[in-house]
Design a protein with these regions (language model features):
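Divalent metal-coordination and catalytic microenvironments
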Residues: 6, 23, 28, 53, ...
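Histidine-rich, glycine-flanked metal-binding segment
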Residues: 2, 11-57
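Single, functionally critical "micro-switch" positions that shape active/binding sites
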Residues: 61-65, 94-95, 119
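Active-site gating loops and adjacent loop-to-helix segments of metal-dependent hydrolytic enzymes
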Residues: 71-105
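Active-site loop-helix segments enriched in His/Asp/Glu that coordinate
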Residues: 97-155
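Histidine-centered catalytic micro-motifs
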Residues: 58-70, 128
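Hydrophobic "anchor" residues on beta-strands that sit immediately upstream
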Residues: 1, 60, 122
Length: 155
């Protein structure tokens, strides 16, 4: 696949914004960035995507997330404010985890994955470990990750 007509952000040293360049992608990996005319000449049959003068950059990486936390967005901890992190676990996270059904695990993962894709994140590390973790939940999360078309390390 060739991505054409974009402004390519390299994030290299030094970071650059390249114009009149194209990106060759093979097997879901950037293989080459070169002059657009050169890549078009060398790969005339390659599938093409017109970036229409928009910015193109490598995907972001989220190195720590909890997909099941999607259901706690905006949720207040009941009662008095927690004194410390263990109390937050006891009052919010562990009760939430204990109440999740397998379909809830899948849905919460998909909510987070859609949000990740919308914001340019293509690789995530999800920590799905807590006292009430459902047997087989990592398999369900892995299926959601595959459906979303991103990469993830699940633990």
């Amino acid at each position: 696949m060739l991505i054409l007509n974009g402004k390519i952000i390299t994030w290299g040293e030094p970071a650059q914004i390249l114009e009149n360049q194209a990106i060759l992608i093979r097997d879901n990996r950037i293989q080459e960035i070169a002059a657009q005319a050169d890549l078009l000449a060398r790969f005339p049959q390659e599938e093409r995507i017109d970036a229409k003068d928009q910015y193109v950059m490598p995907g972001n990486i989220c190195a720590h997330t909890h997909f099941y936390g999607a259901f706690s967005r905006g949720m207040a901890i009941p009662g008095a404010p927690a004194k410390d992190f263990p109390e937050i676990l006891e009052k919010l996270w562990w009760p939430l985890d204990k109440s999740l059904l397998m379909e809830d695990v899948r849905s919460s993962a998909l909510v987070c994955l859609v949000d990740a894709v919308k914001h340019g994140t293509t690789t995530l590390i999800d920590h799905h470990a807590s006292p009430g973790a459902i047997t087989g939940s990592l398999d369900v999360i892995a299926e959601a990750v595959e459906q979303a078309g991103v990469r993830a390390s699940l633990c």
